[in-house]
Amino acid sequence: MAQTNGVLQEPAITTMNGAPVLKPASTQRIGNQLRATLLLQDINLLELIQHITHERIPERVVHARGTSAHGYFEVTDDISDVTSAAFLNRVGKQTDIFCRFSTVAGRAESAETVRDTRGFAFKMFTEEGNLDWLFLSTPVFPIRDGAKFPSFTHATKKNPRSGLPDHKAFWDYFTHNQEGIHFLMFLFSDRATPVDFQHADIFSINTYKFTKSDGSFTYVKIHLKTNQGVKNFTQDEANQKAGVDPDFQTRSLYEDIENQKYPTWDVFAQIIDPVKAENYHINIFDATKTFPFSEFPLRKFGKITLNRNVDNFFAEQEQSAFSPTNLVPGWALTPDPIIQTRALAYADTQRYRLGANFVQLPVNAPYKKPFTPLIRDGAATVNGNLGGTPNYFPSSFYNVGAATQYAQPDEEQFQGTVVNFESEVVDADYVQPRIFWEKTLAEEPGQQDNLISNVAGHLSAVTGDKGLGSSTSGLCNVR
């Protein structure tokens, strides 16, 4: 837009059908006075009021509080020996990305520096379609049985009667689901109060597969290490910042990018050979566990740089939609029960929030135009709907081009009886939490004391001897 004396010269304001509005702030009424009756024929007023009553969309169930940016992924090291993904096939190759960073439990306007896991979602616009990464700031997840996700979510949110934080429900949940103790210890360390998104490491949580065109595959976990250094608040610092500037982490990321202090992360793959995984003492599909770097070293293959803020917060950040089912050749899901559950939940919640055609929104649309003759119609179809192309397959009236041929990966072999399975907590579930306490935190001065203080502060809101005693039972099992 042109500027006059530093002021943008915009076109005249119009109604939604494009007709000019003479006085946008005026209303049609009988008589030139404030007490006069308004007229229903005032189209501008009708549009303004009817739109504002519909301009909000459903809030995300989790990860409601977030911020976004644009950037790119660059291949830094050759990794073509383990994956045929086209966006990884050449050192120096760059792929545009869009990211959304978030807290997990809080509502859309909640404070950002509170104790919580951070979500890191990346959408990569590759030449073979969009690849979505849905990662977290903790290397482990609180559950490994997908059916527990609703209970975990409810227990970490507010009381259904009072609408207030329910610390007793929180601790009661973890008392009965102690496979989450490893996650719980990360949550009450200073790692769960990062200064901002730029100063946090990022983890895939789930196990994925790298696949090759010859049908071979390896298992992989992804790690992103911040180049800004890891920086965390103490509980008191986080509380103070939440009260003074609840938008601090959004502001920090936005201002860094505006000031060309572009945040970057190095991207690593932790490769796990399928043969070794078969008999390894840790189930590679257990999201509550990590894998030692001494046996499965990190292998660098890329770098992420964020270098552009969004042009419109609602159109991009709020309407962005991510799903682990957004995959490309060379990258695949595994039987990890949590990633399988997430595969169902993410796309489904976006259809609820944004409608059946959320992928057509510019922030979500792949650079390569999809050809989906079997997926048509629905509210807000804006991509031409493939015109008169038959909406069934096969058809005598159009020829479908051949897709690039990829050998079907040699999948895991499964044989058994259908059962209702729920994992059980065993002694091995306390091994890694114990290592985290005795080694990881012990090597960082003051971190063991901070964890104890953070837990004690949270437990102080749990009333009743029974509630307090049962709440600490899981942590006592770590020692």
UniProtKB/Swiss-Prot annotation:
Catalytic site: 63
Cofactor(s) the protein needs: heme
Gene3D superfamilies according to UniProt: Catalase core domain
Record keywords: Heme, Hydrogen peroxide, Iron, Metal-binding, Oxidoreductase, Peroxidase, Peroxisome
Enzyme Commission number(s) from the entry: 1.11.1.6
InterPro entries, per the entry: Catalase, Catalase_AS, Catalase_clade1/3, Catalase_core, Catalase_sf
SS bonds (residue pairs): none
Sequence positions that bind heme: 346
Keyword Ribonucleoprotein found: no
CC per GO annotation: mitochondrion; peroxisomal matrix
Lipid biosynthesis found in the keyword field: no
Record-level Gene Ontology MF annotations: catalase activity; heme binding; metal ion binding
Alphabetical GO biological process terms: hydrogen peroxide catabolic process; response to hydrogen peroxide
Localisation: Peroxisome matrix
Function: Catalyzes the degradation of hydrogen peroxide (H(2)O(2)) generated by peroxisomal oxidases to water and oxygen, thereby protecting cells from the toxic effects of hydrogen peroxide.
Family of this protein: Belongs to the catalase family.
Protein name, as recorded: Catalase A
Species in which this protein is naturally found: Botryotinia fuckeliana
Source lineage: Eukaryota, Fungi, Dikarya, Ascomycota, Pezizomycotina
Gene name of the encoded protein: catA
